[in-house]
Design a protein with these regions (language model features):
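Small/aliphatic-rich secondary-structure junction motif
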Residues: 1-59, 138-141, 151-220
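Structural beta-alpha unit
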Residues: 13, 39-42, 66, 73, ...
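A structural preference for short, hydrophobic beta-strand core positions in alpha/beta folds
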Residues: 34, 92-96, 145, 185, ...
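Short secondary-structure boundary segments
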Residues: 36, 119, 187, 245-247, ...
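A short acidic, glycine-rich active-site loop
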Residues: 55-73
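Glycine/threonine-rich flexible loop motifs
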Residues: 123-129, 251-256
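Charged helix-capping and loop-helix junction motifs
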Residues: 129-132, 200-203, 256-261
Length: 277
């Protein structure tokens, strides 16, 4: 098993992603893999019928390949700079995969302990935005979004409402939850009334499940708007990660009108997010 850092060739984003990946991997004692996925330049070619057009296509392919080489070089440099010290005691490798980032991300998330995306993927224009959305929304595999600051030694916050998304998030990310050692169960009881309540929404159900995995836990109720309350709790407790179900309502609706997931993704300051849908 390993922790995979999804890289895009942007120095600041790749450094933060790698730092988060290394921080998680240290606690799990597993290798780190830096992954830069770019499609085959020739895959975008349109069949041309004239010699002139064919020549133009060949030139375009070479230009795209040259640009990709630059992206790969930047991604590798950022990854190597963070991991080269060796003080973390982990095996760290960089790889370039010829594939679309959506498929490469889903393949990585299938069996990895964690797949870490940069904080910037909440922006539609980010190179890895489609990959992040595909892995989370279509493949329905777990993802980690790097925080705006390095991982701390604090607890993990689990945003618990008994929903399928929350359950999948905590089950998918169990290894991370156990590695950080302590869980804060956060719940806004008033917010539960917005949807049909489930018996599993009772924090006691999660507490019993955590007990079977020997994970320490405590409850800390929150009030008001969920996302801002979670962020305030994370800041006050020094939490390293927020584990949460993602997009319990329409993703488009959340983007247009706001929602807990979208507000967490858009927050200018926050810890890492471990998400599942």
């Amino acid at each position: 098993m390993s922790v995979v850092a999804m890289l895009e060739g942007a120095d600041a984003a790749d450094r933060a992603t790698t730092q988060t990946a290394v921080g998680i991997a240290q606690r799990l004692n597993v290798p780190v893999r830096g992954l830069c996925a770019l499609p085959d330049p020739t895959a975008t070619l349109i069949v041309m019928s004239t010699p002139e057009a064919t020549g133009l296509a060949a030139n375009a392919t070479r230009d795209i390949a040259a640009l990709q080489d630059q992206v790969i070089a930047r991604a590798k440099a950022s990854f190597d700079d963070i991991t080269s010290s060796g003080s973390h005691g982990l095996t760290c490798t960089f790889s370039h995969v010829v594939d679309i980032a959506e498929r490469a991300g889903a393949n990585a998330a299938t069996l990895a302990d964690a797949v870490v995306f940069p904080h910037s993927v909440q922006k539609v224009a980010d190179p890895l935005s489609l990959s992040f959305e595909y892995v989370l929304m279509e493949a329905r595999l777990p993802v980690v979004m790097a925080g705006t600051t390095p991982l701390q030694a604090g607890p993990v916050i689990v945003a618990w409402d008994g929903s399928n998304g929350a359950a999948r998030a905590v089950r998918f990310h169990l290894s991370i939850v156990k590695a950080f050692g302590e869980v804060i169960i956060a719940q806004n009881e008033k917010d539960l009334g917005k949807d049909q309540q489930r018996d599993a929404a009772n924090p006691a159900a999660l507490e019993e499940w955590l007990d079977t995995h020997n994970v320490k836990h405590k409850r800390m109720p929150i009030e008001g708007e969920v996302a801002s309350s979670l962020l305030a709790l994370a800041k006050g407790s020094g939490a390293s990660v927020i584990v949460a179900g993602a997009y319990g309502h329409s993703r488009i609706g959340e983007r247009l009108f706001g929602g807990t997931t979208q507000r967490l993704l858009d927050a200018p300051e926050r810890p890492a997010l471990a998400l599942a849908r």
